[in-house]
Regions:
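Membrane-interface motif at the C-terminal end of an N-terminal transmembrane signal
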Residues: 40-54
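N-terminal intrinsically disordered, acidic low-complexity segments at the extreme N-terminus
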Residues: 1-17
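C-terminal structural cap/anchor segments
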Residues: 361-405, 411
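The feature marks the first
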Residues: 91-94, 109-120, 124-164, 168, ...
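Flexible coil segments in periplasmic/lumen-exposed cytochrome c-class electron-transfer proteins
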Residues: 53-72, 97-117, 148-229, 233-234, ...
Length: 471
């Protein structure tokens, strides 16, 4: 049948032309599909949820409020204060500040393999910011991912989550932004190669990964649960880092909060699984972690999460943090295959005596640890004053050291820790300038073997890639 069909000749010139048209149509479709597939890879590169005021009172309930109260020209002090709190919850300052002397003025470069995105100015400057935006413009950007000029926004701006935020809350944020000092600053233009500079292609990404619509409270759940769900799914956009990506670089809805790696840092599993996730954490543990960035003897925030704590979650009310904890406890458990909890590994070192007086080898992990790390973490790895929030933490029973992947440990050695909260200032210096890739790998592998998960390790090549991942 196939052979006979292949020998059939067109009836005439018209039929030949029809075949050519069909072939061209198929080629166009295939080309468009190829462009979309390549473009989808770009979408994996999201802005960091990075980055001081007193902690604000709890905001209003989850349910939608009258959008008319958000008019910028008539914003009340209460509305502005509420908007500031919500802007903290959304960590707006993180991506929209490249220079602390001009907060919210944008210009933060987001480097990708396909070029660089620069975040926009969202101060009320009429020429370079959003001073000429109407409330409708702002709502459309937050809820639909469409800018004032009708351009489609890149999902580095998490409109896929912000679409769930009520109109009242969006307009409260708008009212707060209108009170900022206008900064006349034009961020650099995006430098993206074709076809990644074609914003209209976002239409296809949205078809697969975006559903517009506000948060709908679950009438069967408690007010606290609904409040936590509203924050986590909306303004806090936790899934952007903690949920793996599908082939289009949208979120894998079947693996929500199961953990993912971005820019070298691994955002851990935060489902209710008692081994792989945080199902064994108490509400007090979660509140402590989000407000102070640390659960003594268990976990400490570093990298992008440390910045989220410093610039966002530490300012949320205790009531809201408890609501987040209640909601996260209900997230379905997803196992990552771990046999033990990350915070149950390790034992104190006892080899320091044999190392005293010996010549330091450039790649001996134990010797390098004693020389570079023991002053703060003690040669036993048990830390100094490790029970206090701002102390030098123990490496034993430490969730970073006990993780299946050693990425975060190597990243901390390379890039350090800088976390400022109302509880304490935590600073660990970067060793990127002092240690070579093989030395960082040696220390990392010694620490995981002695104080953490002995099955976790990094290679020199992996360290080399991690070294530039956050630069």
């Amino acid at each position: 049948m196939t052979n006979k069909t292949s020998r059939v000749q067109p009836a005439g010139p018209g039929a030949q032309m029809q075949i050519q048209i069909q072939r061209r149509g198929r080629l166009r479709i295939a080309s468009l599909a190829a462009v979309f597939s390549v473009f989808a890879l770009y979408l994996a590169w999201h802005a960091s949820n990075d980055p001081d005021e007193q902690r604000e009172a709890s905001v209003t309930a989850v349910f939608a409020q009258d959008a008319s109260q958000g008019g910028a020209a008539f914003a009340s002090p209460g509305l502005v204060k509420r908007g500031e709190y919500l802007a903290r919850a959304g960590d707006c300052i993180a991506c929209h500040t490249s220079d602390r002397s001009r907060p919210f003025a944008g210009g933060l470069p987001i480097d990708t393999p396909f070029g660089t995105i620069y975040t926009p100015n969202i101060t009320p400057d009429p020429d370079t910011g959003i001073g000429r935006w109407t409330d409708a413009d702002f709502l459309r950007a937050m809820h639909e991912g469409i800018g004032k000029g009708g351009e489609r926004l890149y999902p580095a701006f998490p409109y896929a989550e912000y679409t769930r935020v009520t109109e009242g809350d969006v307009l409260a944020i708008r009212a707060y932004l209108n009170t900022l000092v206008p900064v006349h600053y034009t961020p650099p233009r995006n430098d993206l190669k074709f076809p990644f500079n074609q914003r209209w292609l976002m239409l296809f990404w949205n078809l697969f990964n975006f559903t517009e619509g506000r948060f709908v409270p679950d009438p069967k759940a408690s007010a606290q649960w609904n409040r936590g769900a509203y924050l986590v799914q909306g303004l806090a956009h936790c899934e952007e880092c903690h949920t793996p990506r599908n082939f289009t670089q949208g979120l894998k809805t079947s693996e929500r909060f199961a953990g993912a790696t971005q820019a070298g840092w691994h955002a851990f599993n935060i489902t209710s699984d008692k081994t792989s996730g945080i199902g064994n954490w108490s509400d007090a543990d979660m509140v402590s972690y989000l407000s102070a960035g640390v659960v003594p003897g268990r976990a400490g925030a570093a990298g992008p999460m440390a910045e989220v704590v410093a610039d966002s979650t530490q300012y949320l009310s205790t009531e809201d943090l408890r609501s987040v904890a209640i909601y996260m406890r209900s997230v379905p458990a997803i196992s990552g295959g771990e046999v033990r909890r990350r915070d149950t590994w390790g034992q104190p070192a006892n080899d320091v005596i044999s190392l005293r007086g010996t010549k330091i080898s450039g790649v001996n992990g134990a010797q390098l640890f004693v020389a570079n790390c023991a002053t703060c973490h003690h040669w036993t790895g048990q830390g100094i004053g490790a029970s206090a929030p701002g102390a030098y933490p123990s490496l034993i029973h430490n969730s970073t050291v006990g993780a299946v992947t050693a990425n975060n440990l190597a990243m901390v050695i390379l890039h350090g820790v800088n976390r400022t909260t109302k509880t304490a200032d935590v600073l660990m210096p970067s060793f990127a300038g002092e240690l070579t890739d093989d030395q960082v790998a040696a220390i990392t592998n010694y620490v995981t073997k002695q104080f953490g998960n002995p099955q976790s390790s990094v290679t020199v090549d992996q360290v080399a890639k991690l070294r530039v991942a956050q630069q």
